[in-house]
Amino acid sequence: MSYKKLEIWRLSRELVIEVHNMTFLHPKFEQFEEAQQIRRSMKSVKSNIVEGYGRRRYKQDFIRFLIFSIASLDETIDHLETLSETGSLKDSRLSENLHQKMTLLSKKMISFLRSVEANHNEFPPN
């Protein structure tokens, strides 16, 4: 099995693309501040899923990287809220749509983490 078959990876990949595209809607001064931060934190969500999956042979490593990924998603949600609250992201429907998708991903990631904690042996090393 490949990490690309994980639903949490697929959802995070979609969000990386959506967040990346959303950041070009911001004023120029935000391109190098909050917009850059939200792109990085969202990419970190996906990357930590991949790295954790690559270390799935070692239960604690797998869990640690999933926790890093969840923390990065929390950071991303905070950046999204900041962009909305400061008026840098003016499209409230886009903001709400992204927030809903991130919240759904968060729930799925927590569920996946619990599954790994309880059933680690079901994840073959290769």
Pin down the residues of each PLM region:
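Amphipathic alpha-helical assembly/interaction segments
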Residues: 1-126
